[in-house]
């Protein structure tokens, strides 16, 4: 009976972590594809030049893939050392997430202010030779979200000149339209648009976050239960 429960728990955890590992592989693949296909598609922030969408997805994918592999191997080998390592890794990730969320809400006003300032400083690099990625990023977000600048369209004036904005700020985009002072522009800043997007999708984002939290807690519960079960039955596959 005990052995049957152990087998059931072992393969349940293996399948759970196999899905986890496959998700990590998928994220890693998407990150590599973004890095290769988008070239210098970079971050908006000059303070964190390596924090691009591609690098972020690659980092998350790698962490998920390694964690999933650790859980798969620990479960199928019934290795207490690997199971305990898997539990500790998930616990560290969970605590880091909670700390970041708490800090974000405690210092929300300061985060918003610093983010706006950093993004405005990034605008100064818009037309520089080595920052094609930043230029592409701004062009895409302004076209997709129908916004202009960080707080509003006037953020571009110190960068491109008085009454001059990127062409993607125009409601009807055409070559050179940003230099025409009579052209209708998107007047809302992109920072506000992004905040509105998060607010409109907060229920979906909350659901996704809750699913991730449940998966982490289940992973920790499975690993510790299997660890205790192996310990009680005297199964020894320790490295």
Swiss-Prot record:
Belongs to the tetraspanin (TM4SF) family. Glycans are attached at residue 180. Residues 35-55, 107-203 are extracellular. PROSITE patterns: TM4_1. It comes from Mus musculus (Mouse). The chain crosses the membrane at residues 14-34, 56-76, 86-106, 204-224. Its main location: membrane. It is found in: Membrane. The keyword Manganese does not apply. SUPFAM superfamilies: Tetraspanin. It is a multi-pass membrane protein. Glycosylated. This is Tetraspanin-9. The lineage of its organism: Eukaryota, Metazoa, Chordata, Craniata, Vertebrata. Disulfide bonds: none annotated. Strongly expressed in megakaryocytes, platelets and lung. Weakly expressed in bone marrow, brain and kidney (at protein level). Residues 1-13, 77-85, 225-239 are cytoplasmic. Found in a complex with GP6. GO terms for biological process: collagen-activated tyrosine kinase receptor signaling pathway; mitocytosis; neutrophil homeostasis; platelet aggregation; receptor diffusion trapping; regulation of mitochondrial membrane potential. GO terms for molecular function: signaling receptor binding.
